[in-house]
């Protein structure tokens, strides 16, 4: 089951992909945009629950193992820049907490923002914000952490 670590990018990737898709939604499809954003956040929440179960041992004890997935981003001469993501018990708990609270915010916003004409833009930026926050949690390279931090600032 630890092979799933190579797919952990889906947790922040789904909200970011949702933000990109929502940016092309027409302003008249307000309810569809809200349900689409909530659906992508719900899938991220389910994926974070899977990561949480991976980070915990089947005997109920918390594992101290850090699972990482690295790949080469680019090579410059003899220098190789490798980036990736990691999963340990602490960020597994944080992934569950952030995706759960984000999902609650997304669901609450359906009713709260239903009369706002810019709800599609709201959900696009909210999805981008949630994806960047989740990217902060799984990054294992300072450059990716900084990029996600800047996107959080941009989306807020």
Q: Language model features by range: what are they?
A:
Residues 1-7, 13, 25-96, 100-124:
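Transmembrane helix-loop-helix hairpins at membrane boundaries of multipass inner-membrane proteins
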Residues 12-27, 155:
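N-terminal signal-anchor/start-transfer transmembrane helix
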Residues 15, 88, 126, 135-156:
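Functional transmembrane alpha-helices
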Residues 20-24, 133-138:
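Alpha-helical transmembrane segments of multipass membrane proteins
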Residues 40-43, 101, 129, 149-153:
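Transmembrane alpha-helical core residues of multi-pass small-molecule transporters
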Residues 46-50, 132-135, 155:
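Transmembrane-helix signature of multi-pass solute transporters
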């Amino acid at each position: 089951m630890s092979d799933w670590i190579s797919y952990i990018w889906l947790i922040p990737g789904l909200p970011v992909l949702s933000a990109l898709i929502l940016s092309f939604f027409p302003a008249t499809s307000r309810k569809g945009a809200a349900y689409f954003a909530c659906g992508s956040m719900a899938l991220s929440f389910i994926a974070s629950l899977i990561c949480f179960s991976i980070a915990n041992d089947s005997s109920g004890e918390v594992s101290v193992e850090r699972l990482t997935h690295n790949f080469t981003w680019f090579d410059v001469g003899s220098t190789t820049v490798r980036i990736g993501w990691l999963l340990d018990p602490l960020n597994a708990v944080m992934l569950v907490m952030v995706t759960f609270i984000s999902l609650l915010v997304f669901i609450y916003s359906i009713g709260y923002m239903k009369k706002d004409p810019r709800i599609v833009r709201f959900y696009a930026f909210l999805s981008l914000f949630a994806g960047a926050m989740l990217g902060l949690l799984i990054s294992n390279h300072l450059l990716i952490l900084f990029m996600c931090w800047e996107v959080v600032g941009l989306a807020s």
